[in-house]
Swiss-Prot record:
UniProt protein name: Rho-GTPase-activating protein 5
Annotated site residues (Arginine finger) in this chain: R90
Biased composition (Low complexity): 306-323
Gene3D superfamilies, A to Z: Rho GTPase activation protein
Biological process terms in GO annotation: negative regulation of Rho protein signal transduction; regulation of cell wall (1->3)-beta-D-glucan biosynthetic process; regulation of fungal-type cell wall organization; signal transduction
Domain annotation Rho-GAP: ranges: 52-245
Entry coiled-coil feature ranges: none
Keyword Zinc: no
Keyword tags: GTPase activation, Membrane
Region Disordered, residue ranges: 306-345
Localization per Swiss-Prot or TrEMBL: Membrane
InterPro entries for this protein: Rho_GTPase_activation_prot, RhoGAP, RhoGAP_dom
A Pfam family reported for this protein in Swiss-Prot or TrEMBL: RhoGAP
Length: 361
């Protein structure tokens, strides 16, 4: 992260402004950089990002892209612990704990990626997750694409397949960061929708809750007909999200390697320039969750190279296999190849791995 210091001002008498004033301005600027909530998606990815992966039916993991670390960390926690919690995205968490979480995810150099969830509930995580999405100054689907994403739901007599094809083209047109975040969110929301018999979060409910942060227009917020069209569009995207995942038919994720990264690494794919070196096996801690009160009780350890499965992890609509993920707060770093993506293979849920910075301020 680059901090612009600027030039000391010279007054009419040729004297330098006080060092105290200059230092105060510098500290304010660095403090502003730490306010992750309310940043644009592009800026949030520059501050702290996590790599996301897809898993094919044969178990092969493939690199897909990046999402903000706060989304990955909360999303991972929620998918592992909250898919059967009633009203998970409607029930409020503790305002005090939410403030602590928001500060943790907004403070460098770690930005919450190694945050310990013990003592926090899934409702705290769900509130922080929603807050980050809703506070982005530009929605997940940018305003310039707003009408195009509503259009397929306003044309009469279209079949679902025709609408799917229209949305595929529109999703492909999105900027890469927005497309990757949108597909991750749709995947996550579909997981909760598939468990609606227990969590009461139907796809309709989820579309109503997340539509303001994903697909909305400031001029349409007070007109029920307009925002209902947006909710219907998001509902369709959730219900058909498996049709929008771009998959990799031939190439696979390269072996995990210890790769130095720059704080200014962009959100685009990184080209591998050196032969990968396998890293040593490490272990991660997975939370044991009490669904009655939404709290964490104990820890379990798994080998990083083992396939950890979870009894409450739902199967996605890509396959009937259980999901296994690596906590986005866990090492190692990776190098990834640039891939040309296609839709020829079926994929499971998104997976996340942390991409930590080598150089920290």
């Amino acid at each position: 992260m680059t901090v612009v210091v600027g030039v000391l001002q010279i007054d009419d008498m040729g004297k330098k402004s006080s060092f105290a004033s200059w230092w105060k301005q510098l500290r304010v600027k660095k403090s502003d950089d730490n306010k992750l909530f309310g940043l644009s998606l592009t800026r949030a990815l520059e501050v702290s990002k996590v790599a996301i992966f897809l898993t094919r039916r044969d178990g092969e993991k493939v690199f897909y892209g990046y999402i903000p670390a706060v989304v990955a960390k909360c999303g991972f926690f929620l998918k592992q612990n909250a898919t059967q919690v009633k009203g998970i995205f409607r029930v409020n968490g503790s305002s005090k704990r939410i403030q602590i979480l928001q500060k943790a995810f907004s403070t460098g150099p770690d930005y919450g990626r190694s945050f310990d969830w013990e003592g926090y509930t899934v409702h705290d995580a769900a509130n922080v997750f929603r807050r980050f999405i809703n506070l982005m100054p530009e929605h997940v689907i940018p305003l310039e694409y707003y009408e195009r994403f509503r259009e397929p739901m306003t044309i009469p007599n279209l079949t679902d397949n025709e609408r799917v094809e229209m949305y595929r083209r529109r999703i492909d047109e999105l900027p890469i960061p927005n497309r990757q975040l949108l597909l991750y969110l749709l995947d996550l929301l579909s997981v909760f929708a598939m468990n609606s018999s227990k969590n009461l979060m139907t796809a309709d409910n989820l579309a109503a809750i997340f539509q303001p942060g994903i697909l909305s227009h400031p001029d349409h917020e007070v007109y029920s007909k307009d925002y209902q069209i947006s909710q219907t569009a998001l509902l369709f995207l959730i219900n058909h999200q498996g049709s929008f995942i771009k998959t990799i038919p031939l190439s696979s994720l390269p072996p995990l390697v210890a790769a130095p990264t720059s704080p200014n690494t962009s959100s685009t794919l990184i080209t591998q320039s050196a032969a990968p070196t396998p890293i040593a096996s490490t272990s991660i801690r997975i939370n044991s969750f009490n669904p009655r009160n939404g709290s964490i009780k104990r820890w379990r350890s798994f080998s990083r190279h083992s396939s950890a499965t979870y009894s409450n992890s739902p199967s996605s609509n890509f396959s009937n296999m259980k999901s296994s993920e690596v906590d986005p707060g866990s090492p190692p770093r990776i190098k990834s190849r640039s891939y040309s993506l296609s839709r020829s293979s079926s994929m499971k849920l998104f997976h996340t791995l942390d991409r930590r910075r080598e150089n920290r301020m």
